[in-house]
From Swiss-Prot:
Keywords: Acetylation, Cytoplasm, mRNA processing, mRNA splicing, Nucleus, Repeat, RNA-binding
Biological source species: Gallus gallus
SMART domains: RRM
Gene: SRSF1
Lineage: Eukaryota, Metazoa, Chordata, Craniata, Vertebrata
Major localisation: cytoplasm
Protein name, as recorded: Serine/arginine-rich splicing factor 1
Amino acid sequence: MSGGGVIRGPAGNNDCRIYVGNLPPDIRTKDIEDVFYKYGAIRDIDLKNRRGGPPFAFVEFEDPRDAEDAVYGRDGYDYDGYRLRVEFPRSGRGTGRGGGGGGGGGAPRGRYGPPSRRSEYRVIVSGLPPSGSWQDLKDHMREAGDVCYADVFRDGTGVVEFVRKEDMTYAVRKLDNTKFRSHEGETAYIRVKVDGPRSPSYGRSRSRSVVVAEAVVGATAEAAVIPQEEAEDLHATLPATADPDLVHKRSLALIFL
């Protein structure tokens, strides 16, 4: 690792460039340099202060190894109460909501595409504004803990996965019905809930069967396991009760495995 300091010059290798998000509104270039100088010589700091949106920056090092060290050392770093998001920029910059339809509301959208790390500690977010990206959502949800995956869909919903279960639980308690702001300044109040067994899996396939139970008071309960696609024919397949006087209540329970 070489010495610190900002060296002004032509842009270098993209492997040397990192993205820094979730910065405080009063951040200065010198403040960013102070956070990253120990990782190596800095070629350039490009601070973006957008009206109505949180600032972010691109920091370019002389050596790609220093950039990698900075990502590992400063991602999630608490700076003046703000948990920094530090990562390598992703290629294929995109805008707007994803195309396509059906399923979970269309293809994913985002400025650089969602990260690939996944977790079972997942929440579903609804009520996102049209310009909200996965990065905006990830920044918002990181107030509750370490986010390892975030994605958004064109129907205004999103999915967020946390590293730890307690962070997921805290996110529902702290961030449900909070004000969300996109990188374009659009705001909306969002709802956050734990992804339950009946919620969309957003790309994770689940093998399911339907357990059908017929509960009859005064008679023996009957149960059968049938494929989910046959559930709609349920009433045609269940046996009728011979003596209606014995029936007090009849109910069907569908349990997705």
